[in-house]
């Protein structure tokens, strides 16, 4: 189908012209304007226009690419221009405003942070003092309990010694009493 338009008139001319010497016949047909030749030529043009779309498609493709590149280039130029304007606006107005606001806010924040730090240091110091007093009290209380315990243990030992002494005396008394009772029993058993 493609390329058939240029070959069709040549194929039609050869049978009508006869055998060898086709170059002369073609020249003679080309110079004479016979109706068959004109019809064949018109048929070739119609055939090539109807069936050979390469030139049209190539033209349309070139036009589309050209339009696309131009529009894309304009779009990209507009996007770059907008970006440049945004950067300029940011550098000239937004950035200094943000810097000033940040410096003002940070100075207030720094003051509040220093005040909070001082408060925390005071609270920590008070807590440490309270813990020290509490620990000192615990140590003194523990020492007092140890001394009381030692006194208690000494008292218990002395009481134990007293009780042991009383018990020993009571045992001796009981032994003497039982020894005497045995003597008395021995006297009565002789009766």
Swiss-Prot record:
Residue ranges of coiled coil: 160-191
Domain of life: Eukaryota
Region Disordered, residue ranges: 1-32
Gene Ontology CC: axon cytoplasm; BLOC-1 complex; transport vesicle
UniProt keyword terms in alphabetical order: Acetylation, Coiled coil
GO biological-process terms attached to the record: anterograde axonal transport; anterograde synaptic vesicle transport; endosome to melanosome transport; melanosome transport; neuron projection development; positive regulation of pigment cell differentiation
Self-association state and partner proteins as the record states: Component of the biogenesis of lysosome-related organelles complex 1 (BLOC-1) composed of BLOC1S1, BLOC1S2, BLOC1S3, BLOC1S4, BLOC1S5, BLOC1S6, DTNBP1/BLOC1S7 and SNAPIN/BLOC1S8. Octamer composed of one copy each BLOC1S1, BLOC1S2, BLOC1S3, BLOC1S4, BLOC1S5, BLOC1S6, DTNBP1/BLOC1S7 and SNAPIN/BLOC1S8. The BLOC-1 complex associates with the AP-3 protein complex and membrane protein cargos. Interacts with BLOC1S4, BLOC1S6, DTNBP1/BLOC1S7 and PI4K2A.
Protein name per the record: Biogenesis of lysosome-related organelles complex 1 subunit 5
Organism field: Sus scrofa (Pig)
